[in-house]
């Protein structure tokens, strides 16, 4: 295989045992720093991706991704047509913020009116054929979460007073919130924090409290394949009002994303510091190899080829460090659960998600910095004059 002369000389310098032990030590430290930096950056970004995906699955699966509504209530028998490809389905919904009150406690939450158990992932495991038994129309019954039941101290068959602060009625004592007694007909379990504030009732019963006529609903609830595609909805529903999950959880996910970006920035500084050692090691090599550079120039090596020798030399250090760091980072990420279990056998769950695009960015970032770090030493090497360098040889 025919290598360019500059690459051939760079390979010889890279593999040769230098008499300058300090320069060799600096080069090895640069490679080690790049390995650790790239590995740490891939692991941290993968963990942050996993945590973001886990939070998206746990938090956003339990709340409406989006509600599309008109100026007037929509008919529950009418379907929403021309759905975007990223929308799984659309179902009628009545939902509002409420205050739950019992003799044993008070709690704020959200009530969702549904037509069947398949309308919400929190209760879709219930027997669909028993919907009219559990949430019959006109009987004002509720299905609540286990955490909410504990807060209010209620069980199946107990009464809960629901107060809707958004709607009110006038009485001789002034304006008071709409309220109604509901009976707990069943309890759902799990699903994180949602079971502490979300309850379900027949869509018609909630509509009555919201002053919506029977056979009508507040709007359509949309289920998206990816909740983060919510920004594409306005162009598909330009005339409708869209309320989405960002009202409730937008700040939380902005904080998660900012944390991921800041962690990536801080870890990337490790790579920057490590690659700065390439400048030092190449500068020492230029001083050490001045005589050889001069001899090569007298034998026909041009200044551009001299520059290429040291550019290749720095890129070799950066490439080897980046490649090893990427391999170790991927291996550590794939086995992170076992590693964490070995270090802390308390059953800690740490979700991870490797992103090919992020890996390419990390590798490209490391190689680009490696290239930039070679420019000054390569320029200094090309400035060596054979006559001056060989004057005392």
Curated annotation (Swiss-Prot):
<feature type="transmembrane region" description="Helical">
    <location>
        <begin position="25"/>
        <end position="45"/>
    </location>
</feature>
<keyword id="KW-0812">Transmembrane</keyword>
<keyword id="KW-0813">Transport</keyword>
<protein>
    <recommendedName>
        <fullName>Lipoprotein-releasing system transmembrane protein LolC</fullName>
    </recommendedName>
</protein>
<feature type="transmembrane region" description="Helical">
    <location>
        <begin position="356"/>
        <end position="376"/>
    </location>
</feature>
<dbReference type="Pfam" id="PF02687">
    <property type="entry name" value="FtsX"/>
</dbReference>
<dbReference type="GO" id="GO:0044874">
    <property type="term" value="P:lipoprotein localization to outer membrane"/>
</dbReference>
<dbReference type="InterPro" id="IPR025857">
    <property type="entry name" value="MacB_PCD"/>
</dbReference>
<dbReference type="GO" id="GO:0098797">
    <property type="term" value="C:plasma membrane protein complex"/>
</dbReference>
<feature type="transmembrane region" description="Helical">
    <location>
        <begin position="262"/>
        <end position="282"/>
    </location>
</feature>
<keyword id="KW-1003">Cell membrane</keyword>
<feature type="transmembrane region" description="Helical">
    <location>
        <begin position="314"/>
        <end position="334"/>
    </location>
</feature>
<dbReference type="GO" id="GO:0042953">
    <property type="term" value="P:lipoprotein transport"/>
</dbReference>
<comment type="function">
    <text>Part of an ATP-dependent transport system LolCDE responsible for the release of lipoproteins targeted to the outer membrane from the inner membrane. Such a release is dependent of the sorting-signal (absence of an Asp at position 2 of the mature lipoprotein) and of LolA.</text>
</comment>
<dbReference type="Pfam" id="PF12704">
    <property type="entry name" value="MacB_PCD"/>
</dbReference>
<dbReference type="InterPro" id="IPR003838">
    <property type="entry name" value="ABC3_permease_C"/>
</dbReference>
<dbReference type="InterPro" id="IPR011925">
    <property type="entry name" value="LolCE_TM"/>
</dbReference>
<keyword id="KW-1133">Transmembrane helix</keyword>
<dbReference type="InterPro" id="IPR051447">
    <property type="entry name" value="Lipoprotein-release_system"/>
</dbReference>
<comment type="similarity">
    <text>Belongs to the ABC-4 integral membrane protein family. LolC/E subfamily.</text>
</comment>
<keyword id="KW-0997">Cell inner membrane</keyword>
<keyword id="KW-0472">Membrane</keyword>
């Amino acid at each position: 295989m025919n290598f360019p002369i500059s690459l051939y000389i760079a390979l010889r310098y890279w593999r040769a045992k230098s008499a300058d032990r300090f320069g060799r030590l600096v080069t090895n430290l640069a490679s080690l720093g790049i390995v650790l930096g790239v590995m740490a950056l891939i692991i941290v970004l993968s963990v942050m991706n996993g945590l973001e995906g886990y939070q998206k699955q746990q938090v956003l699966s339990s709340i409406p991704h989006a509600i599309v509504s008109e100026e007037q209530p929509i008919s529950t028998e009418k379907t929403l047509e021309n759905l975007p490809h990223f929308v799984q389905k659309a179902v009628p919904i009545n939902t509002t913020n409420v205050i739950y009150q019992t003799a044993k406690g008070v709690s704020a939450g959200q009530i969702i009116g549904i037509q069947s158990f398949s309308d919400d992932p929190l209760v879709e495991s219930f027997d669909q054929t028993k919907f009219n038994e559990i949430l019959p129309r006109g009987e004002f019954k509720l299905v609540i979460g286990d955490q909410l039941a504990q807060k209010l101290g209620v069980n199946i068959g107990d009464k809960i007073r629901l107060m809707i602060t958004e709607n009110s009625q006038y009485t001789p004592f002034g304006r008071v919130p709409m309220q109604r007694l509901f009976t707990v007909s069943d309890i759902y379990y799990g699903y994180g924090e949602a079971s502490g504030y979300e309850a379900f009732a027949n869509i018609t019963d909630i509509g009555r409290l919201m002053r919506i006529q029977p056979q009508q609903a507040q709007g359509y609830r949309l289920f998206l394949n990816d909740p983060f595609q919510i920004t594409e909805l306005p162009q598909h529903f330009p005339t409708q009002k869209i309320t989405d999950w960002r009202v409730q959880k937008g700040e939380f996910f902005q904080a998660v994303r900012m944390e991921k970006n800041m962690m990536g920035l801080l870890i990337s500084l490790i790579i920057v510091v490590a690659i700065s050692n390439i400048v030092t090691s190449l500068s020492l090599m230029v001083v050490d190899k001045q005589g050889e550079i001069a001899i090569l120039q007298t034998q026909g090596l041009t200044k551009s080829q001299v520059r290429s020798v040291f550019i290749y030399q720095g890129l070799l250090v950066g490439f080897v460090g980046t490649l090893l760091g990427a391999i170790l980072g991927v291996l550590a990420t794939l086995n992170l659960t076992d590693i964490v279990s070995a270090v802390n056998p308390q059953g800690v769950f740490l979700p991870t998600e490797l992103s090919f695009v992020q890996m390419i960015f990390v590798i490209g970032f490391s190689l680009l910095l490696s290239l930039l770090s070679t420019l000054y030493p390569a320029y200094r090497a090309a400035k060596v004059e054979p006559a001056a360098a060989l004057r005392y040889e």
